[in-house]
């Protein structure tokens, strides 16, 4: 069980409802500090959060997840002045724009990877940190394909691949930073957006999404925090229809186990070979 009490949490996101609702739940967990790096400033939301737990310190920065990594470092240098250290980094920025592939990939995947690369030295127990947890909030269409949101699905598949790779014991045993992902099912706020299919053939299906059954952002947020509290390095969760389900991971490449064992073997063992 991962106890959030007294933890310093950094949440990188857009202005979507899941991020705000997740922060509301986090504020009930007696966290010490909350750093919010959002694409749009929302003073009313910050006031709502502060009212939940006045003793928790909240800091806010307007943050563009698609910025260059050197610019990100300047932001996180400021974050560290206020936070001292980061226990939990949550990556939640997301964009579904099938007509703008570059922005979709840069927001959902490239920006998330650059953020992780920027923040990891501050969390790495062999560098500036004391270990911690990275949580990548992604989508169920990163596990199964979406014929209508092809670019969005591809970016979310990338998040899963990056998460599983970064969670490898090769890193975790040295830096002490666990990495996990939560795949959210459709929420009402998502389907209410003006969405366009990758190809026009799929638009009728996109339009039907508006009346499809889906979960509330509030329920989804509660399950994201529940997954964090059950954190184990490398785990992937599904938060959908009000439920939280652990994904059963599988190796498809028949050489994968042999390659991983070779990578983790000692240099002495390799010399003997």
UniProtKB/Swiss-Prot annotation:
Pfam families: adh_short (PF00106). Substrate binds at residue 139. Disulfide bonds: none annotated. Keywords: Oxidoreductase. One of its GO terms (molecular function) is oxidoreductase activity. The active site is at 152 (proton acceptor). CDD domains: ADH_SDR_c_like (cd05323). Belongs to the short-chain dehydrogenases/reductases (SDR) family. This is Alcohol dehydrogenase-related 31 kDa protein. It comes from Drosophila immigrans.
């Amino acid at each position: 069980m991962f106890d959030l009490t007294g933890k310093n949490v950094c949440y990188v996101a857009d202005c979507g409802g899941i991020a705000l609702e997740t922060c509301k739940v986090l504020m009930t967990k007696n966290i010490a500090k909350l750093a919010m790096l959002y694409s749009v400033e929302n003073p009313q939301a910050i006031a709502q959060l502060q009212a939940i737990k006045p003793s928790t310190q909240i800091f806010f920065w307007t943050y563009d997840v698609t910025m260059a990594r050197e610019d990100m470092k300047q932001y996180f240098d400021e974050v560290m002045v206020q936070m001292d250290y980061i226990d939990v980094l949550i990556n939640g920025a997301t964009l579904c724009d099938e007509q703008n592939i570059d922005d979709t990939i840069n927001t959902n995947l490239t920006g998330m990877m650059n953020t992780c690369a920027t923040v990891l030295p501050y969390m790495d127990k062999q560098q500036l940190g004391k270990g911690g947890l990275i949580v990548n909030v992604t989508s169920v269409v990163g596990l199964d394909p979406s014929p209508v949101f092809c670019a969005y699905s591809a970016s979310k598949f990338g998040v899963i691949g990056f998460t599983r790779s970064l969670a490898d014991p090769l890193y975790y045993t040295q830096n002490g930073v666990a990495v996990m992902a939560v795949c959210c099912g459709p929420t009402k706020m998502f389907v209410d957006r003006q969405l366009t299919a990758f190809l026009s053939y799929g638009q009728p299906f996109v339009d039907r999404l508006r009346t499809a059954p889906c979960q509330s952002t509030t329920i989804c947020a509660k399950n994201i925090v529940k997954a964090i509290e059950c954190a184990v390095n490398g785990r992937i969760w599904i938060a959908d229809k009000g439920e939280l389900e652990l994904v059963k991971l599988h190796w498809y490449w028949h050489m994968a186990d042999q390659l991983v064992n070779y990578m983790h073997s000692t240099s002495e063992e390799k010399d003997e070979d």
